[in-house]
Design a protein with these regions (language model features):
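Small-residue (G/A/S/T)-rich helix-start motifs and N-terminal tracts that mark the onset
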Residues: 4-92, 101-118, 123-248
Length: 248
């Protein structure tokens, strides 16, 4: 669970707080230096426990934006936590990966949110959200994304080739990105960028569009400099800061 506040991590001036199971504290502190760490109680599966819910709810009051789902895990505790975050957060929430999987049994929770929501499913997650096949999703991406966003009052980022971003009314189809970005970590990077832009004051739809475009452009430049086969998520992250200066 990432809580963002301030000017945005891509500018190295954001306040970023990471909420995570206590047992991974040594790993977090040995690899990251920028975030504020907020370790909380965990269950037997080493994921966030229901006992951490009060602490997480308190942390929501600190944030300008919340991103939840990346590496979260799937069990009863995480389902309760994600649903409660959606219902109680007064700031925008970005749902990715297991954050999306955690609402599959209670999609109506999206309609009970107090604050704006952004969902970032890949085609498989989108298929599970609407009870369809991946082939059905891929055959009608724009209509399906737009309908879901309209029915659930959210911004939807349907990832893939030509990522679709929609608020249920307007639609943006992205033209940046390449097959080399189909690797672990790129979706997490995008989620963080969307959350960062929202924390800087952008509305959710604009933040999602900008993040998707710049994220894809970052991947394209990385592929040009290295190769689509050889590029890594670390290569993209190393390039992002310099790329952002082009948009100031």
């Amino acid at each position: 669970c990432l809580l963002s506040r301030g000017l945005g991590d891509v500018y190295k001036r954001q306040l970023l707080k990471c909420v995570f199971p206590r047992s991974v504290y040594p790993v977090m502190t040995s690899h990251l230096v920028q975030p504020v760490f907020s370790p909380v109680s965990e269950n037997e599966e080493k994921t966030l426990s229901i006992g951490s819910l009060n602490r997480i709810t308190e942390e929501l009051e600190w944030a300008d934006c919340v991103a939840i789902g990346c590496g979260l895990g799937k069990n009863d505790d995480t389902q309760v936590i994600v649903n409660q975050v959606i219902r109680s957060s007064e700031v925008p929430v970005v749902l990715d990966a297991d954050g999306i999987n955690s609402i599959l049994l209670n999609i109506d929770v999206l309609k009970n949110a107090h604050a704006p929501l952004v969902l970032t499913p890949h085609p498989g997650e989108m298929a599970r959200l609407i009870g369809a096949s991946v082939a059905q999703v891929e055959s009608d991406r724009i209509r399906i994304a737009k309908q879901f966003a309209a029915e659930n009052s959210c911004v939807l980022v349907l990832k893939g080739a030509n990522t679709v971003v929609t608020d249920g009314n307007s639609v943006f189809v992205n033209v940046t990105g390449n097959p080399g970005m189909a690797m672990g970590g790129t979706g997490d990077m995008l989620t963080g960028m969307i959350g960062s832009f929202i924390a800087q004051g952008m509305d959710c739809y604009s933040a999602a569009k900008c993040a998707v475009y710049i994220h894809g452009l970052c991947g394209d430049i990385t592929a040009q400099e290295i190769s689509t086969r050889g590029m890594t998520i670390e290569d993209m992250l190393d390039l992002l800061g310099a790329l952002m200066s082009e948009f100031e």
